[in-house]
From Swiss-Prot:
Protein name per Swiss-Prot or TrEMBL: DNA-binding protein Msp_0595
HAMAP family cross-referenced by the UniProt entry: dsDNA_bind (MF_00026)
Keyword set, alphabetical order: DNA-binding
Family: Belongs to the PDCD5 family.
Organism of origin: Methanosphaera stadtmanae (strain ATCC 43021 / DSM 3091 / JCM 11832 / MCB-3)
InterPro entries, per the entry: DNA_bind_arc, PDCD5-like, PDCD5-like_sf
Amino acid sequence: MSDLDEIRRRRMEQLKQQQLAAQQQQGASLEQMQQEEQARQQFENQKKNALRQILTPEARQRLANLRLTKAELVNAIEMQLIQMAQAKRLQIPVTDATLKQILRETTSNKREIHITRK
């Protein structure tokens, strides 16, 4: 019976070590996810602050409304506005009329597809 007890004890130790290793791995991946989330939030805060300085309240409201339907387009335009402001190629603050013009220029590049039925 002592051999059987010894085998059980070893197996229990192995299982405990495996469980501990799994918990450590989960903890490491959880920490990594938290760091990534924190970095993403920090980036979003920096972007929001930059846009606050670049855009007038009316222009910010227009982007917020547009975000409801075309989030990818708004993200691209926001990044474009920030880059243009950093390169000093943009007159700050950007008014609603200027933003409308930028939106027209950005969206006019897309081709329209017409389907005619016979």
